[in-house]
Amino acid sequence: MIGRTFKTDIADYETARPDYPPQITEWLNDEFSVNETSTILELGAGSGKLTPRIIASQPKEIIAVDTYVEMLDVLKKKFPNVDCRVGSAMAIPLEDESVDLVACGQCFHWFANEEALKEIYRVLKPNGKLALIWNIRDNSVPWVEKCSQLLEKCRGGPLNMFEKAAELFPGYGFTELKQSLFTSAKKYSIEDLHRLMNSFSSINRLPVEEKEKMHAELDEIIKTIPRAQNTDQVDFNILTVAYSSEKVPIN
């Protein structure tokens, strides 16, 4: 994760954060014409949650960039053929006009600013593309909405991920964002739900007493979740919001 400081429990992040649905690979191929000649920069790659979907799109090369060295180490162990580099969105360690696509999974809100967009513009080839992807909770489910409200309370307010992105486009040499939406589901155990909350940077930073209070409140929410008898497995619906934009000449 790049920009403002992102810190999390890597084990919780790996275990509890949802993977991206297979439709993302199809979207990469269809929306961006990814093929065997494409070079893709995965910016803010973290531990490589998005990486398998990029690999499945069969590009020529994938370069993963992140400031969080420990996360990149996890990615490299999982995907040894990916070129991992330490760097930030404001100082991408790549040559000018060297990549066909910059893909950002679950991270653009950390560096949604003019400086980062100028740097992304620099490394993209002419008519290169930008992909912004987020997995979000389906707040139409009452207990999930309560979890989201608990998270916002701990954060001190909503994250406003999409609003930050929308304010920048069109502009800075990029076209208006085009949105696509995908749905999927993941089964979580009760322990997984606690680990999911721990994976958020704002929760990870809380003092021990406040974190314990948060988990106690989460336990009360969990009691309201409908589920089959003699199981601690719950269905967690996931919405994946994906945006595309194209680099255009700046007058």
Swiss-Prot record:
Pfam family for this entry, one: Methyltransf_11
GO molecular function, a single term: trans-aconitate 3-methyltransferase activity
Subcellular location: Cytoplasm; Nucleus
Keywords, ordered alphabetically: Cytoplasm, Methyltransferase, Nucleus, Transferase
Gene3D superfamilies cross-referenced by the UniProt entry: Vaccinia Virus protein VP39
An individual GO BP term: cellular response to amino acid starvation
EC numbers for this chain: 2.1.1.-
Enzyme class, broadest EC rank: transferase
Gene Ontology cellular component annotations, sorted alphabetically: cytosol; nucleus
Task performed by this protein: Probable methyltransferase.
Family: Belongs to the methyltransferase superfamily.
Protein name: Uncharacterized methyltransferase C25B8.09
Organism annotation: Schizosaccharomyces pombe (strain 972 / ATCC 24843) (Fission yeast)
